[in-house]
Amino acid sequence: MSVFTPVTKKQLAVWLQNYSLGSLTDLQGISSGIENTNYFVTTTQGKFILTLFEKLTSTELPFYLNLMAYLSEQGIPCPKPIESQDHALLGTLNGKPASIVSFLPGQSMTQIREEQCAQVGEILAKMHLAGLNYNGKNRNPRGLDWWQTAAGTVMPFLSRSEQSLLDEELQFQIKQRTTNLPQGIIHADLFRDNVLFTSTGIGGIIDFYFACNDALLYDLAITANDWCTLGDGVMDKARMHALVKAYQAARPLTAEEYPAWPAMLRAGALRFWLSRLYDYYLPRPGELTHKKDPEYFRKILEYHLTNPSVLPSLQA
């Protein structure tokens, strides 16, 4: 989350008149993240999160907001969009589509234990199962087509070795594309900073604005790449086992998913290496912005390329 579009207290106070949330008492920009403008909002009725959407349009946004509303009703601890007095989940503020959602308790974790990985695996599986009955459809905006376009854009900035790695992995992933894996709604960005923990467990899952329809296993791989890395690209086998075992307890993997796992881990690493390269070399102007290091995911991709045998058995 970042601040690209400034909002003053006066502007927000006027905007909030169309909501039954009481009077504004505090407004603070959130600097983490890279996609949207976000603020902590405090009113006389409690805390909320305000988001101004910098890329997504008013045509695209109903999928995400309705999905969060649906998952919240299904017991998934995610932000619940607040309706305006006109019963709309989406408004306009300072020329940008905007929404305000419930504030969830907890904090993101930096020191990860197996127990937390297990909790994340369980909640991800429950979200996948709940999403099977959601009628909305959204093609992955960061899928293969985007990978190829983004790769062409960032390629001139890369060293020869990085160019070779990127090109070879793209060609590999093109050959791996298949539709025989279980599909459904995926979060597509369930990193450590998007899961909030309280003293009793997970308090919330946030940032659903990359959610889409894709292979459920791909979502598990994206999650594993961040939650199970030791920080230098190396995967922690114990954490990986805890994550996958807890996931499978809620949604057992199919026979088709087992052999696809190594390629999915590589796909998840490639996708975020590309997006971080793009944001690093082609940043957007912002009042408060947060760049993320592309090397983090390049190292993870290289690890999966050279250490496929260390992947834990999903059947264990």
Curated annotation (Swiss-Prot):
Superkingdom to which the source organism belongs: Bacteria
GO biological process, one term: threonine biosynthetic process
UniProt keyword annotations, A-Z: Amino-acid biosynthesis, ATP-binding, Kinase, Nucleotide-binding, Threonine biosynthesis, Transferase
Gene3D superfamilies reported for this sequence: 3.90.1200.10, Phosphorylase Kinase, domain 1
Enzyme class, first EC level, given as a word: transferase
Pathway: Amino-acid biosynthesis; L-threonine biosynthesis; L-threonine from L-aspartate: step 4/5
EC number(s) recorded for this UniProt protein: 2.7.1.39
UniProt xrefs under Pfam families: APH
Keyword Oxidoreductase carried by entry: no
InterPro entries documented for this protein: Aminoglycoside_PTrfase, Homoserine_kinase_II, Kinase-like_dom_sf, Pseudomonas-type_ThrB
Entry-linked SUPFAM superfamilies: Protein kinase-like (PK-like)
Catalysed reaction equations from the record: L-homoserine + ATP = O-phospho-L-homoserine + ADP + H(+)
Alphabetized CDD domains for the sequence: HomoserineK_II (cd05153)
One MF term in the entry's GO annotations: homoserine kinase activity
Family of the protein in this entry: Belongs to the pseudomonas-type ThrB family.
PANTHER family registered for this protein in UniProt: AMINOGLYCOSIDE PHOSPHOTRANSFERASE DOMAIN-CONTAINING PROTEIN (PTHR21064:SF6), AMINOGLYCOSIDE PHOSPHOTRANSFERASE DOMAIN-CONTAINING PROTEIN-RELATED (PTHR21064)
Protein name: Homoserine kinase
Organism: Nitrosomonas eutropha (strain DSM 101675 / C91 / Nm57)
Phylogenetic lineage: Bacteria, Pseudomonadati, Pseudomonadota, Betaproteobacteria, Nitrosomonadales
